[in-house]
């Protein structure tokens, strides 16, 4: 089988993390976000992945080719000269997708359990042109709702309904037969607004209800929530602790779901967790408290600092007695001096912060 991943554009909602790398390469639970998808695709026999790319294509190719070779997956890069929406990239990559097999299409910023095997079985069972994965949400009035019958046949799409019509939304994971390519022109086209309604009207589109967790990692708060859902899922489905290794000091306390890369070090009397990811070669010095946060690769957190609900980019240095909270996001190579307080601060890469940021601000 083949798959096409819609890589998208600049990832502006996840800045400053995406100012130095494309969004699919941002580390999520110590792997590039896209690698979670590629590993799940390879596990169900996908041998060719087409990446519909536009922003920092060379950087994406350099890193993902290494992972694809390890997985035994052929990567094809389909470069958009101009934005083509969510359907146009399929037309652009048509020559790579035209065969008898159904193929996957994924939004690159979706994190879930990726039940691709079950999706394929469901798609073959109903025998129609397309399958959309849908997921349950608590506040359907904020989204476009998918209305479908008990057997999955989609009747309608209702955008931000004022009255209750259902609580399932498009989860950004699809399976299509190659016949869909005849519906899509090579121009900017929305698959959700222009192609799916056509398919539903002709009875060719079905909904597969995702089990388990799901998150569209759009903004930093979504990143952190998705990380929590992911860690709790892994904790309940995997035997053994997530945070293990000789580099965690014996006096350190691990609380709840915590993922520590084996190459990272955690100092004495630290309290780590819940919902924390510590990346490769990260150094956490003594007495540090971290919760609901992720520390990306090659960063350092100094003695007795407090980090809560925050994302620290790659190669950052956090001084001693620093306090960061309320969705602080540091780009790569940021230095925070000792005893600085950051509250809901977004700091662009390569900055040095020596004064407090007591309220929401962007440090350029």
Swiss-Prot record:
The keyword Nucleotide-binding applies. Residues 2-220 are annotated as: Substrate-binding domain. Pfam families: GMPPB_C, NTP_transferase. GO terms for cellular component: cytoplasm. PROSITE patterns: HEXAPEP_TRANSFERASES. It is an enzyme of class 2 (transferase). SUPFAM superfamilies: Nucleotide-diphospho-sugar transferases. Mg(2+) binds at residues 109, 216. It comes from the Eukaryota. Enzyme activity is reduced by incorporation into the GMPPA-GMPPB mannose-1-phosphate guanylyltransferase complex. Allosterically inhibited, when part of the GMPPA-GMPPB complex, by GDP-alpha-D-mannose binding to GMPPA. The active site is at 160. GDP-alpha-D-mannose binds at residues 109, 216. It catalyses: alpha-D-mannose 1-phosphate + GTP + H(+) = GDP-alpha-D-mannose + diphosphate. GO terms for molecular function: GTP binding; mannose-1-phosphate guanylyltransferase (GTP) activity; metal ion binding. Component of the GMPPA-GMPPB mannose-1-phosphate guanylyltransferase complex composed of 4 GMPPA subunits and 8 tag-335/GMPPB subunits; the complex is organized into three layers, a central layer made up of 2 GMPPA dimers sandwiched between two layers each made up of 2 tag-335/GMPPB dimers. Catalytic activity of tag-335/GMPPB is reduced when part of the complex and binding of GDP-alpha-D-Mannose by GMPPA induces allosteric feedback inhibition of tag-335/GMPPB. Belongs to the transferase hexapeptide repeat family. The N-terminal substrate-binding domain adopts a Rossman-like fold and has a binding pocket for GTP or GDP-alpha-D-mannose. Substrate binding is coordinated by an Mg(2+) ion. This is Mannose-1-phosphate guanylyltransferase catalytic subunit beta. It comes from Caenorhabditis briggsae.
